[in-house]
Swiss-Prot record:
It catalyses: [[Fe-S] cluster scaffold protein carrying a second [4Fe-4S](2+) cluster] + N(6)-octanoyl-L-lysyl-[protein] + 2 oxidized [2Fe-2S]-[ferredoxin] + 2 S-adenosyl-L-methionine + 4 H(+) = [[Fe-S] cluster scaffold protein] + N(6)-[(R)-dihydrolipoyl]-L-lysyl-[protein] + 4 Fe(3+) + 2 hydrogen sulfide + 2 5'-deoxyadenosine + 2 L-methionine + 2 reduced [2Fe-2S]-[ferredoxin]. The gene is lipA. Residues 189-407 form the Radical SAM core domain. [4Fe-4S] cluster 2 binds at C203, C207, C210. Residues 1-23 form the signal peptide. This is Lipoyl synthase, apicoplast.
Length: 442
């Protein structure tokens, strides 16, 4: 009868342990593959088969002991790993899924990240499909059948209207009231209020809602325009004036120097007059913004025109939503004493949620005043009106805006960015600030 050697007993015990711990696995390799989802770095067989320092392993039996202690170490590693996982799950229940996922290893999060990326792509695609279904304004599209009654305004007439028109023509000055075909021209001019348009009557941009003439190379600005503007304003019996301009991307500074010179001349002649300036974005040029912000004006205005989604359909490609908001923010940072102002046209296919989102973005950029008005198509060659927004909806946006913290909101079908209703309120705001400043200096 053959006697079994101790080495055979050890080997048989090793096979039993492998079968017991790893199911039907009969080799070391298959045992490794059934390693209870342990981290890859802990599965290096070379690390687990290093020379052991166990006291019962002498030189002859060291190799056999390694096999035994491999199973022993595998078991210990498995228990430790499961213990860590249990602790993580416990923390997950206490502090939420974000903490739990942050505690997981890279190999464990790989599947979740892949699934998360797929969900993000799916949501993005669904959002794009929803936006495609929303109406957008286009040149030549069908207009609403009938203009509501609240848009019927009387034709511009009156002595002041005629005198103002003659003065502007004599001094070769342009107004946005005429160029943009504003429906309030008769009302504003009869109380001696006009919005002077500087830098000529030709714009270098081609926004699809605007009726002002366009050209890539307009005539050079009139050098006498700042003097003529200051002369006209000083002759008129007004305390609040609005200056605006066309976009002049052909000029190095966008026309900022010309604009600033006009303001300085007006302030030199009549220091008490309040000036609001509706300016371009100057392509985001900080030096041009600084020049205007420090020129002496009280109100710095620049319009975002419409909600984020409709920017590419409504505005020139050189203008964008983020840049317009950034311009107003920079102006306020340069001169904190300025009031900043913007305007949004309604009726171009925007949704209520998009308008509220735009209002929130505007307020986050520390802009003080916002106005809302109905878009009206100047000619058949411009964007169509998607809808006529009701006066009740304009009132709703005004109420929501006041909750957001705007200092003033002008909201109505016929309201425009330089509408007189806003001027009265802005005048009182500026005078209050002036009084507070004088009191503090005294």
């Amino acid at each position: 009868m053959r006697v079994l050697t101790p080495s055979l007993y050890i080997y048989a015990f090793f096979i039993f342990c492998v079968r017991f711990k790893c199911g039907n696995r009969t080799t070391v390799a298959s045992a490794i593959r059934a390693s209870y989802d342990m981290p890859p770095k802990e599965l290096r067989v070379g690390d687990m088969l290093k020379k052991t320092s166990q006291p019962n392993c002498n030189y002859r039996t060291r190799g056999k002991c390694r096999k035994f202690f491999f199973v022993w170490k595998l078991d210990k590693m498995r228990d430790a790993h499961l213990g860590v996982q249990a602790k993580r799950r416990k923390n997950h229940l206490r502090s939420g899924s974000a903490t739990y996922e942050a505690s997981l290893g890279e190999h464990q999060l790989k599947g979740k990240r892949k699934e998360s990326a797929t969900n993000v792509e799916k949501e993005k695609k669904e959002k794009e499909q929803q936006e495609e279904r929303l109406p957008v304004p286009k040149v030549g599209n069908k207009m609403p059948e009938k203009k509501p009654d609240w848009f019927h305004v009387p034709a511009p007439t009156g002595k002041k209207y005629n005198k103002l028109k003659e003065d502007l023509k004599k001094l070769k000055l342009h107004t946005v009231c005429e160029e943009a075909q504003c429906p309030n021209i008769g009302e504003c001019w009869n109380i001696g209020t006009a919005t002077i348009m500087l830098l000529g009557d030709t714009c270098t941009r081609g926004c699809k809602f605007c009726s002002i003439k366009t050209s890539s190379k307009p005539l050079a600005p009139d050098a006498n325009e700042p003097f003529n503007t200051a002369k006209a304003i000083c002759e008129w019996d007004i305390n609040y004036v609005v200056l605006t301009s066309v976009d002049r991307d052909d000029l190095p500074d966008g026309g900022a120097s010309h604009f600033a010179k006009t303001i300085e001349l007006i302030k030199f002649s009549r220091p008490e007059i309040l000036i609001e300036c509706l300016v371009s974005d100057f392509q985001g040029n900080v030096d041009s913004i600084r020049k205007l912000a420090n020129s002496g004006m009280e109100v710095y205005a620049h319009n975002i025109e419409t909600v984020r989604r409709l920017q590419k359909f409504v505005r020139d490609r050189r203008a964008n939503y983020e840049q317009s908001l950034r311009v107003l923010k920079i102006a306020k940072e340069i001169n904190p004493m300025l009031y900043t102002k913007t305007s949004i046209m309604l009726g171009l296919g925007e949704t209520k949620e998009e308008v509220l989102e735009a209002m929130s973005d505007v307020r986050q950029h520390n802009i003080d005043v916002i106005t809302f008005g109905q878009y009206l198509r100047p000619t058949k060659n411009h964007l169509n009106v998607v809808e006529y927004v009701s006066p009740q909806m304009f009132d709703f946006y005004k109420e929501e805006g006041m909750k957001m913290g705007f200092k003033y909101i002008a909201s109505g079908p016929l309201v425009r960015s330089s509408y007189k209703a806003g001027e009265y309120f802005m005048k009182s705001l500026v005078e209050q600030r002036r009084g507070a400043k004088t009191h503090a200096q005294g």
